[in-house]
A protein has these predicted regions:
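Catalytic center-proximal scaffold of phosphoryl-transfer enzymes
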Residues: 1-258
Length: 258
């Protein structure tokens, strides 16, 4: 037997609803909240989740004194069942949002088996559009200003894939610098060389040598050599895309080259 309409749910049951809904689904969250054969409807679980409000992250009680801060910024596709009410999505391609995630940390520790971010703090949500992006970054930089001694802080490194919204953040603080993350750099270099078979490693080495030597012109030449021996149009497009990506993010790559 299910709960009657408008029946009250205890705080303990609400907690179990939210825990299970985060891990699996609305339906299982409703089942997990009850004892015996009773269950809370998935619509009730959904309503509980949708009414949640998350306060802004409180600044640290005492300002910390560090010379460098690191920010990792990324986004992901999330599929929606609907936007505001069931049935309002008519086309499959419009049922996704791209929430943004930012985490601020002071360093990375390694204990021999895993890496751990030092004093990590998280920000994120569906901050859509230009104004949403600025609002999110303002929250991040307000937290930094209130939590860290600005006289000691020298640089803020923002790691990401080079998306416009990430670059916006790098332009909103005088001490912020955009850094292209290594994953995306390696991905594009591999994409540009994978078809070269036995020569692939040599071509990659030439690109990495140009990067480590801080020679942009040499990196451009390396990509042009690959294009010269690439016959298939589809692969040529991949090489051209990688070339534009690496050269277009050159300043961000150089921030991590010592």
């Amino acid at each position: 037997m299910g709960l009657e309409s408008h029946a009250r749910i205890s705080e303990d049951a609400e907690a179990r609803i939210l825990e299970e809904a985060v891990e699996s689904s609305y339906r299982k969250g409703g089942i997990n909240a009850c004892i015996g054969e009773q269950e809370v409807s998935k619509e009730t679980v959904m309503n509980k989740l949708h009414t949640l409000e998350f306060p802004l992250l409180e600044p640290l009680k005492e300002k910390r004194r560090v010379s460098r801060l690191y920010i990792d910024a990324d986004e992901d596709h999330v599929s929606l069942q609907y936007l505001e009410k069931k049935g309002d999505i008519k086309r499959p391609r419009v049922n996704t949002v791209m929430p943004k995630l930012i985490y601020v940390y002071e360093d990375v520790n390694f204990d021999g088996s895993k890496h751990e971010l030092v004093n990590c703090h998280y920000f994120g949500g569906d901050y859509a559009g230009t104004e949403g992006t600025k609002e999110l970054w303002q929250e991040v930089f307000d937290f930094i200003t209130e939590s860290y001694d600005e006289e000691v802080l020298e640089k803020i490194y923002i790691n990401g894939d080079g998306a416009d919204w990430i670059r916006t953040g790098a332009g909103m603080h005088a001490k912020a610098r955009f850094v292209l993350d290594r994953f995306h750099m390696h991905k594009y270099i591999i994409s540009a060389t994978s078809h070269l078979k036995d020569s692939a490693q040599d071509a990659r080495s030439e690109i990495y040598k140009a990067i480590n030597g801080k020679r942009k012109w040499a990196a451009e030449e390396a990509f042009d050599k690959i294009l010269h021996v690439t016959e298939k149009e589809t692969k040529a497009k991949a090489v051209e895309s990688a070339k534009n990506y690496i050269l277009g993010n050159w300043a961000g790559i150089m921030e991590s080259v010592r």
